[in-house]
Amino acid sequence: MITPILLIKATVDGMIARRFGRIVNITSSAVKHPIDILGLSNGARTGLTGFVAGLARKTVGHNVTINNLLPGPFDTDRLRSTIAIQAKTSGRTPEEVVRDRHKANPAGRFGDPAEFGELCAFVCSAQAGYITGQNFLIDGGAYPGTL
């Protein structure tokens, strides 16, 4: 939480002076649905989200937006290594773990990193100037809430 806040503080004034800036924090879907074994991470990510909520409303009048991307499971090296560990500890194959994880997600799959990148590119674009202080949950519909 501290490092992203310090980076924002170090760059936001220059963006305001130029009257253009886009800040995008990559946090986690755990901001909306905390993961029980990641207590400190849940708290730090939620703290950053709270910081952004206040600051984003002060900077948007200068064409500087600040938003958060909250990814769920994406098909990355990290996810594959986590699946391998989960398979080993549960006595299943990685393919079985993937199948079960896919079944648990309404989209029936993991996210494609390109999908994540495309959303990030849009949020950074000039066309996204009216979007600020938002948390974009990208999880294939896994989070069951409405807010």
Residue map of PLM features:
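A short, exposed helix-loop element centered on a Lys and neighboring polar residues
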Residues: 8-9, 53
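Catalytic loop of short-chain dehydrogenase/reductase
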Residues: 16, 22-48, 52-61, 73-74
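Short, flexible catalytic-loop segment of classical short-chain dehydrogenase/reductase
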Residues: 32, 71-85
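Short C-terminal tail/terminal secondary-structure segment
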Residues: 33, 121, 132-147
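Short, small/polar-rich loop/turn modules that mediate ligand/substrate recognition or access, typified
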Residues: 60, 65, 131-133
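Conserved SDR Rossmann-fold cofactor-binding beta-strand/turn motif
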Residues: 65-75, 124, 137-139
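A conserved structural motif in NAD(P)-dependent oxidoreductases
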Residues: 93-94, 105-116, 127
